[in-house]
Amino acid sequence: MRRASRSPFILSPVAHAVSRLVLCATLGWTYAGSGHAQVPAPAGGSEVPLGARPPASAPVAAQQETPLKLKSSPALAEEVPNGPGDEGPTFVFGDSVSGRPNLETVIDGNAELRRGATSIRADRIEYYQPEDRVKSRGNVRINNAGNRFEGPELEITLDRFEGFFTQPRYRFLSNGGNGQAERVDFIDDKHLTAHRASYTTCERDNEASWKPAWELRARSFEFDFDEEVGVANGAVLRFKNVPILGFPKFSFPLSDKRKSGLLPPTLNMSSVNGFEVRQPYYFDIAPNRDATFSPAIMTKRGVDLAGEFRYLEPTYKGELRANILPGDKLRNRDRWSYGYQHSGTIDSGLSAIGNLGVNLNLSRVSDNDYWRDFPIASNSTTQRLLAQDATVSWNRGFFAAAVRTLKWQTLQDLSAPIVPPYDRLPQFTANYTRVDAPLLGLGRGFDWSVEGDYTRFSADRTLTGQPNSNRAFTRAQLSHPWLSPAGFITPKMQLHATSYQFDAPLVNGARSASRTVPTFSLDSGLQFERQAGFLGRSFTQTLEPRAFYVRTPYRDQSLLPNYDSGANDFNFATVFTENAFVGNDRISDANLLTLGVTSRLLDPATGAEAVRVGVAQRLRFADQRVTLPGALPITDRISDLLVGASVNWVPQWSFDSTVQYNPKTKQSERSSIGVRYNPGNYRVISAAYRRQRNISEQIDVGWQWPLNDLWGDKGRDLGAGQGQGGGRYYAVGRLNYSVPDRKLVDAIVGVEYDGCCWIGRVVLQRTQNGTATSDTRILFQLELVGFSRIGANPLETLKSNVPRYQYLREKINTPSRFTTYD
């Protein structure tokens, strides 16, 4: 029997007689990790790696007297592989070490044993080499790849990681989940069973009176770290020490990895549907496929069945949603809806053609009232036009072509009927485009293109009041941009040609019509720069005047039906365009000049734009005679004046404003003003005022802000997706107020509470779904961080409605095993 004071050991199946206090031997083979050690060279002069058995002729004394040579590694491996054989080297440390070679080693006082990614600390450790078994007593702590266990007694076989731990506390690396048990049985290094145990993601503190805000208590837990799943048997979920849910068997995630099983139920209270309970079940079909089945009970309507299927491949992806409500008790009929989206490419099988692009967007519902009764299911409270749209496209080099079919379902409201758009059954498009290309020996620099469109427009003539038609449209254009740092000039010529074949005669008796319209435009601009200083800051100030002239002769189009044209909105994006209309049924006559000027203040170091101010106005040299059906021609020689400003002087503040001013009436026709204050994460307030004279006037306010600021608690900046610390309340919401009607149009108001390991949310949502009707619902959710969510889910509602809303918790990467390194 030999004893040694506090010193490191490397254990070996071969005993070496030693007389020094530092004992070194090897067990197994060299560990291919962060370091490499060598024992002194034998008589032949070659070195023997640490962990390899020396030749029989190597003098034992020489091996013991010469220090080990360690070679450092630049990084520690995140995954620690086993060495050759099934063992790595085993290291032991302690105040006192005793034992028998090849049989057992006993470490007393500050005992420690390490192998690979496993470390064991205790008051006493007994290591039995033949069985590779460890017994530990007193203040035992084991860390296996970042998962930690603490308790009074541990017995484990290291090579199989099989054994038990009595009365341990544990903490898992992947999500911070922790708890305690009467006993833990280790099945292997990836599987264990905890008996009469608890589980929570609340961070434990050192107070003896500490209790988690929530915990799951169970007769037993089965933890699978390969699948990153836990299973609780005979479980009760307790919140604030009050039992709220019981489960005979319940599985839950140990990370964000997907798994099949029941998802948390959602609860909704709605003035339209009553109280709703929905229980989703998730199917993890494959890494690139999944599905969700979501049955629900609505107290006012009945049983609703919903489902979703998603797939993702290298060249395509898609999503299918379906919903059926048999025997709706409020409408006395079956209700249903479906939606399908697909996008990707397919191989045509012909090398000359190559791949084809395929895009599908199909949606349909059972009746006209669906959008009003189920605004969430139909994805939009104003979704009254549902498309069944399918497109096959192809492109190669400068050429592109597509075939499309588009059919609409129009959901009518008797109090606010709409004219349905035309179906396109089918539509063929093609275009050929060249940029910076040569032309007729004139050299390069020309941009030219030819595009064609053939469409069959179809709709109910009793609703549209005009015949259906086959329309062929062609547009050719040629331009030559001259560009320089000081400015640009771009002359352009266009030719529009259109022909129609009608299924019923026009008012003049014609069953066909044609139209050819040329257009010439000249776009030009200059750019001046200077260094300037404002309010103590240095900027590069620009002055960018622009002039745009367009000339299109008049062609009578008053008898032509309108299938897809509409008036362009008058704004900075459209004021410098040739046609006053979108679509191809109306080409506006024009003899006008648009003048504008923009000035910007740019940060000379970053190029960031601090201020932008712009003005634009059209000067008309002749009346615009081409109009949409029922509209009046434009005779004003001077258009409304557009004035816009954008200010981002400091990152926290932003300001945007656009005004359309009528110089004749000296009144604003349209105006919008928006301001946002965003000093940091989870602090944002935005407000906007929008007015269109004699039509609408609205005030829009949105916010997310910590209420704790009111009493001086500023919290901590933990970064986006991590909140600002526990015990904090956040106000969230958005209000849209109609000034003429003196009422709220839409409203979302809520409060979130961050309790560190749990988050509570209460959100009130009011949605206008008709001229005189609205839907009000209350969304309540309890989120047990890293575990589950219970109740209605308001997160997507908040994200899509509250400007710059941030989640209090977002997915983060699994921590490194060195986070809990011992």
Swiss-Prot record:
Organism superkingdom: Bacteria
Gene Ontology annotations for the cellular component aspect, listed alphabetically: cell outer membrane; transporter complex
Signal peptide limits: 1-37
Chain segments carrying region Disordered: 38-97
GO BP term, pick one: Gram-negative-bacterium-type cell outer membrane assembly
Pfam hit, one: LptD
Protein localization: Cell outer membrane
Described purpose of this protein according to its UniProt entry: Together with LptE, is involved in the assembly of lipopolysaccharide (LPS) at the surface of the outer membrane.
Family: Belongs to the LptD family.
Protein name according to UniProt: LPS-assembly protein LptD
Species of origin: Polaromonas sp. (strain JS666 / ATCC BAA-500)
Gene behind this protein: lptD
